[in-house]
Swiss-Prot record:
The keyword DNA repair does not apply. It comes from the Bacteria. FMN binds at R63, V64, V65, L66, L67, K68, Y78, T79, K85, Q107, Q142, S143, W187, R197. One of its GO terms (molecular function) is FMN binding. Its EC number is 1.4.3.5. InterPro entries: Pyridox_Oxase, Pyridox_Oxase_CS, Pyridox_Oxase_N, Pyridoxamine_oxidase_dimer_C, Split_barrel_FMN-bd. Its cofactor is FMN. Substrate binds at R9, R10, S11, Y12, K68, Y125, R129, S133, R193, L194, H195. This is Pyridoxine/pyridoxamine 5'-phosphate oxidase. It is an enzyme of class 1 (oxidoreductase).
Length: 214
């Protein structure tokens, strides 16, 4: 298998990120960029983010997860704690999250650590999900090896019968994480590959702001 991609390139000319427009708080800029993506007709699932983890095996792993909320404390997402992702974060809570919105020529890379959210918060979010998603969380022992697609569908059918007209309990191994950032990098594509890169690094209760070479 071979394919030459050397000529795959485009010029980025849709925006700029200048010091005069940068707030002191990265959360303000994050919210502004997120809202821009969320309101854009050219962006699907603005809350889709890549999460990179490294467990005790020291092998980096990246997957796309959906951001479910954010506030001044950080970013929230939910998963099966027994999944590869969950095990990695239990062994090493440091991780990296990134958002890329190609149509806006914007990217945000965030470094930080996670903590598990309260069982109450996980319960509240779990029961806000569609019923099918709740059943799916029970049917799938995430990241485990299964014999076939049919095996999964049979489990779902049995669970549908088991919880017919009943409330579906949250699986004990399912819950949320709060990702607490220590660094934000905002990337804005620019012409001639002279992109804007602004780095916020947390220092005690303040943020240090620096421009990085592209």
């Amino acid at each position: 298998m071979e394919k030459d991609l050397a000529n795959y390139r485009r010029s980025y000319e849709k925006g700029e990120l200048l010091e005069r427009d940068i707030p002191d708080d990265p959360y303000i800029l994050f919210e502004s960029w997120f809202n821009l993506a969320d309101n854009s007709k050219n962006v699907e699932e603005a809350n889709a983010m890549s999460i990179s983890t490294v467990g005790k095996d020291l092998m980096p792993k990246t997957r796309v997860v959906l951001l479910k909320s954010f506030d001044p404390d950080g970013l929230y997402f939910y998963t099966n704690y027994d999944s590869v992702k969950g095990r990695d974060l239990d062994e090493n809570p440091k991780c990296c999250i990134s958002f890329f919105w190609p149509s806006l020529e914007k990217q945000i890379i965030i470094q930080g650590e996670v903590v598990k959210v309260s069982s109450k918060k996980s319960e509240e979010y779990f029961h806000s999900r569609p019923r099918g998603s709740q059943l799916g969380a029970h049917a799938s022992n995430q990241s485990s090896v299964i014999p076939s697609r049919e095996y999964l569908e049979e489990r779902l059918t049995k669970l549908e019968q088991k919880y017919l007209k009943k409330e579906i309990p949250k699986p004990k191994e399912w819950g949320g994480f709060l990702f607490k950032p220590v660094a934000f990098e905002f990337w804005q594509g620019r012409a001639s590959r002279l992109h804007d890169r602004i780095l916020f690094t947390k220092k005690d209760d303040n943020w240090k702001i620096e421009r990085l070479a592209p």
